């Protein structure tokens, strides 16, 4: 009888102190893709114990961002503030088992210990004054002082793990002082809550930013003290800005939802974020389904990745070009309305087919579509004077006359234009530019026959007649 492998369970555990930034979104994406690849479970946990900085608005921003990117969790969101009784229960068990202890040293006393260690050329740390040991007499308890609870970290040997991204990592336990796991008011600390959550939620694989590497040996030691099964850990390098510095607001948008506002497609964002620190051969473009199919931790990069706005624009432009015109129209329509345009004024799907090859974002598409979706404004006098010369007006009148009984397809319009050019000995710009100026009030548009077809025969003839 063969045993069934345990279900892989990953988690994303943001702190709701602001929006979901790009680094967090990429970490969530890797955890989501890993779980999906293995038919596992992706858990969302909100680490909201920082009461001063955590807000409901930030929680909602995280949920909105994940929903936009299509990374819905299988379980959660779970909130740490709703699990306080469980944390206190485990702390009580650890105190009972002797793997944690009360420490009455004041913050000033601990700082003095750290300074003394620095003076001796040692790593600054708590010196274990209140750590119980066989045969050791502890100091008298200071009157009226509430203790912290510290974890009794091993004092010899090393704590290591085979990191899914970086390979073997090890810390000498002498470098790790006894971590505070509960504050004087009894509230548990971040590193402790994370451990209990991962244990209770059965997390098997932790993918997170490499700023957490120093937390990992402490968390492993607490898990061992609890008799828990250890998850596998992987630490992903940070994202750098185009200048090689850590990505920050000065490099532009770092809030995921700002990219939605700027007209980036979630499909493109998922593709770009995944490629930023993970690879599948030379494939630059892949669907969400392909990401899930191909994802593995062996191809996560050990070195930092560089944010490249031009590359993101290239990826987004690809997805815009590939998208079905009707679907694209549905996504662009609200952006046209926000600009005061009427998406129903034109066959918007046809307009998308005409405009999308020139667009890098949905915002650019919406702006271009106003050509067809806003009330007609005659060309400015200066433009009309330059391009609507007497000769041009004669050619336009000829075109209008021929158009009266003609079919109004792009092909038929192109044939009309060619006939006028041939009969009058003109070159294309000598008719195409005046047509643009007369019909849409500007000199630059996509192919003039396509523009006229979309504007519609009646509107074109009315505008030419008004010259």
UniProtKB/Swiss-Prot annotation:
A motif ('KMSKS' region) lies at residues 246-250. Belongs to the class-I aminoacyl-tRNA synthetase family. Glutamate--tRNA ligase type 1 subfamily. This is Glutamate--tRNA ligase. HAMAP family: Glu_tRNA_synth_type1. Its EC number is 6.1.1.17. It is found in: Cytoplasm. It comes from Bordetella petrii (strain ATCC BAA-461 / DSM 12804 / CCUG 43448). Monomer. It comes from the Bacteria. Residues 124-156 are annotated as: Disordered.
């Amino acid at each position: 009888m063969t045993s069934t492998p345990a279900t892989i369970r990953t988690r994303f555990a943001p702190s709701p102190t602001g929006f979901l930034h790009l680094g967090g979104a990429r970490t969530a994406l890797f955890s989501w893709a890993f779980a999906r690849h293995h038919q596992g479970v992706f858990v969302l946990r909100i680490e909201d114990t920082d009461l001063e900085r955590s807000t409901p608005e930030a929680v909602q921003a995280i949920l909105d961002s994940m929903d936009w990117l299509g990374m819905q969790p299988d379980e959660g969101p779970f909130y740490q503030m709703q699990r306080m009784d469980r944390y206190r229960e485990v702390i009580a068990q650890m105190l009972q088992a002797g793997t944690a202890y009360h420490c009455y040293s004041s913050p000033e006393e601990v700082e003095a210990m750290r300074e003394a260690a620095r003076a001796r050329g040692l790593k600054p740390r708590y010196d274990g004054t209140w750590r119980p040991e066989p045969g050791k007499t502890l100091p008298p308890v200071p009157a009226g002082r509430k203790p912290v609870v510290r974890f009794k970290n091993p004092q010899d040997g090393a704590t290591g793990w085979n990191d899914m991204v970086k390979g073997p990592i090890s810390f000498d336990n002498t470098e790790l002082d006894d971590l505070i796991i509960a504050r004087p008011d009894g509230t548990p600390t971040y590193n402790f809550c994370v451990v209990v959550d991962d244990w209770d939620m059965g997390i098997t694989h932790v993918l997170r930013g490499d700023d957490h590497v120093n937390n990992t040996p402490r968390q492993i030691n607490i898990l061992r003290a609890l008799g828990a099964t250890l998850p596998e850990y992987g630490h992903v390098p940070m994202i750098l800005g185009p200048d090689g510095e850590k990505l920050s607001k000065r490099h532009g948008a770092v809030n995921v939802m700002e990219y939605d506002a700027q007209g980036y497609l979630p499909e493109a964002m998922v593709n770009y974020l995944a490629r930023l620190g993970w690879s599948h051969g030379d494939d630059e473009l892949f669907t969400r389904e392909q990401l899930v199919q191909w994802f593995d931790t062996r191809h996560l990069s050990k070195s930092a990745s560089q944010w490249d706005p031009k590359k993101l624009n290239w990826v987004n432009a690809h997805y815009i070009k590939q998208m079905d015109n009707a679907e694209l129209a549905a996504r662009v329509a609200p952006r046209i309305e926000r600009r005061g345009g009427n998406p129903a004024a034109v066959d918007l799907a046809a307009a998308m087919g005409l405009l999308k090859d020139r667009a890098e974002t949905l915002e650019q598409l919406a702006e271009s579509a106003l050509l067809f979706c806003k009330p007609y404004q005659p060309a400015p006098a200066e433009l009309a004077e330059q391009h609507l010369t007497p000769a041009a007006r004669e050619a336009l009148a000829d075109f209008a006359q021929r158009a009266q009984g003609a079919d109004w397809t792009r092909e038929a319009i192109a044939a009309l234009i060619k006939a006028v050019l041939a009969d009058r000995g003109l070159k294309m710009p000598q008719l195409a530019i005046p047509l643009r100026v007369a019909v849409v009030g500007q000199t630059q548009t996509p192919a003039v026959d396509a523009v006229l077809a979309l504007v519609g025969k009646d509107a074109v003839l009315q505008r030419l007649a008004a010259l």
